[in-house]
Amino acid sequence: MREKRRRFLKFLGLVAGGFTVFGGFKLFKDDIFKQKISPSKALSQSIANGVIRVQSQRSNVFLYASQHVQDMEDAVIKAANAATDFGWLKTGQSVFIKSVNNSGFPYPATSNPIAISAMVKLLKLKGAQRVIVGDMSGIQHLKFYKDKTIGSSRELMKKSGMLQAVEAAGGEPFFFEEGGWDSFYKDHTDTKGFWDNGLMMPEILKKVDHIVLMPRCSRHVLAGASLGLKAVVGYWRTDTKLQYHYHAKSLHERTAEGNRAKTLLAKQRLVISTGDKLLATFGPDKGYVHTPSIGLVIAAESIVAHDMVSLAWLLYNRTLLPAEEQGTFIDTSTAVAKLGNTLAVKWLGTFGNSLMSEKLLKNDLKRIWDDKVLNHAYRIFGGIPDIHLENIQNTVPEKMLKTLREMVHYQ
C-alpha cells in the first residue's frame, strides 16, 4: 500500500508539471470531447464497405496451459513445436530472438526469462549455430542520441534477470545502441502509409537468417496494450521513435505498419509469449501484476493472430482484477496518455518538439475490436484472421477455451 501511494504521489507531480507546462485545458480536453466514432464501429463500417474482410483461410493459434512456474520451460517448448515444424531453420544458421527489454523491471514488465531461455535451448537443439537475443530499452530508461548515450539496455536486462537467463542458455545478448548511431539502416514497409520515408532498423537484422518474436502480455498507457505488434518499436532508432510519438494521431496505425517492414516480413517465423503473469493495468513498465490461476503460452506464425488471442487473454483477466484496480484514473484516463506521449516527445527530441507534437487520443479497450493497432493490422495484413485455437494436449479448460473463441471470432 505504501509503494502504491508513493507511485501515485509521483504521478500527481508529473501531472501537475505537465498541466503547468503544456496548458491545462488543452491537455485534459479529450476527457471531455469524446471520439465521434468508436474503433469497433469504424471496423464494422470498413467490413460493410468491403475495405476489410474476414480471411477465408484459418489461422492456427496454439495454446498450452500451465499451472506451475516450474513447468513453463516445457510448456514453451511444446507450444513452439506445435506452432512450427522448424523446417525454415537449417543447421548452422542464426536466429535473432526479439525480446521486450523496455525497462529493468522483471517479467511481466519485460519478456519472461524462463521462456527466452527455453527458446534459446530449443533453437540450438534444432541446429541454430547462433541464437542472439536483444532489444533496445525505452526512452524513459535509455537516452540514445547521435552524440551521446545515457543508460544501458544491457544493464537493464541484467537488472530484470533476463541477461543471466540468456547467457546461461547459451544465447548471445545484443543491444542495438551499443553499435552506435550508424549501426542502423533504413528499411521500408511494403505498404504506402505512414512510413513512406522508411524506418531506421538495427543492422543485426540484415545479418541473421531468422527472427523469433517473444513479447509479453501487458497493458500500455499510450497504445492500450503491449503485445507482439507493439514490440516493433524496440527496433527503432531514436529519430524514428521521435516521428512515431510526434505524429501521435497515427501512433496506433504506425505501430501496425512498422510490422510490415520488409526485413520482418522476410525473416520473422514465430511469435510466442507467456501469459502466466500479466501487467494488467497502466504499463508498459509498471502496473498491477495479475497472476491467473492457469497461465497460457500463446504461439502462432501470424503476429496478428497471436495478438488477437493475447489481447483477449489480457481483457479477460482484467475483468478478474480486484475492484480497487479496475477503472482507475491512471489506467483509463485519456489525459494521462496525452501527457505521457508529450513527455516522450520531449525526451526523444526537444521541448519545442513536444509543444508542436500531435496529441494522442486514447480509447478504452473493452473488446479486441476496440484496439486501433489490430484494426489497422487487419487492413494491411490481408483481413481479419479466422482464428482456430489449438488446445495442445487438452491442457486448456474447455470453458476458458470457449470464452477465448467467442472473444476472437468476429460476428
Language model regions located:
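N-terminal and secondary-structure boundary signal
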Residues: 2-411
